[in-house]
Amino acid sequence: MSGEGRPQASVPQAGELRLGIAAIRWHAKITDRLLERALAAASEAGVAEPTVVRVPGSIELPVVCQQLAHQHDAVVALGVVIRGGTPHFEYVCDSVTAGLTRVSLDESTPVGNGVLTCDTEEQALARAGFEDSAEDKGFEATAAALETALVLRELRGFENGRGFL
């Protein structure tokens, strides 16, 4: 895990934005904590009532995030994929990452990728935002999605002659 070069996580004031969060049910201890931290970031940003949807697993995240993107300014995907003894890990990770990127581009809506792809459960715990975790990916993914939504809002205003303030 390399934290070198990582900027300090800051949460923008984004109370006017609509946020959708999709979280998987697998690895509940970790995923529930990712969700708690995502909701903490949303609250800190002033987002009153994010839409939260639970899905069976990581493969289902892209299609649910695509639907959320139709009605929200920013979306966050939360989950955990832990390497096993078969190539399934690579298939799932590649599919989820490509799917979430495609949703973001196709819908012009930022999708914060808070899906942990780890070799071990210990690595996932270290990234999930617990008291003794080195990283806080649910919080970070939410802050990034909200900040990007605000940048897009300003850029779209620029197209209408407003520009950045």
From Swiss-Prot:
List of residues binding 5-amino-6-(D-ribitylamino)uracil: W26, S58, I59, E60, V80, V81, I82, N113
Family: Belongs to the DMRL synthase family.
Pathway the protein takes part in: Cofactor biosynthesis; riboflavin biosynthesis; riboflavin from 2-hydroxy-3-oxobutyl phosphate and 5-amino-6-(D-ribitylamino)uracil: step 1/2
InterPro entries reported in the protein's UniProt record: LS, LS/RS, LS/RS_sf
Reactions it catalyzes: (2S)-2-hydroxy-3-oxobutyl phosphate + 5-amino-6-(D-ribitylamino)uracil = 6,7-dimethyl-8-(1-D-ribityl)lumazine + phosphate + 2 H2O + H(+)
Enzyme Commission code: 2.5.1.78
NCBIfam families: lumazine-synth (TIGR00114)
Keywords associated with the record: Riboflavin biosynthesis, Transferase
Lineage, broadest ranks: Bacteria, Bacillati, Actinomycetota, Actinomycetes, Pseudonocardiales
Record protein name field: 6,7-dimethyl-8-ribityllumazine synthase
GO molecular function: 6,7-dimethyl-8-ribityllumazine synthase activity
Alphabetical list of Pfam families matching this protein: DMRL_synthase
Function: Catalyzes the formation of 6,7-dimethyl-8-ribityllumazine by condensation of 5-amino-6-(D-ribitylamino)uracil with 3,4-dihydroxy-2-butanone 4-phosphate. This is the penultimate step in the biosynthesis of riboflavin.
Keyword Cell division included in the entry's annotation: no
Cellular compartments per GO CC: cytosol; riboflavin synthase complex
Enzyme class at the top of the EC tree: transferase
Residues in coiled coil: none
Source species: Saccharopolyspora erythraea (strain ATCC 11635 / DSM 40517 / JCM 4748 / NBRC 13426 / NCIMB 8594 / NRRL 2338)
Binding positions for (2S)-2-hydroxy-3-oxobutyl phosphate per the UniProt entry: G85, T86, R127
Catalytic center residues: H88
Gene Ontology biological-process entries: riboflavin biosynthetic process
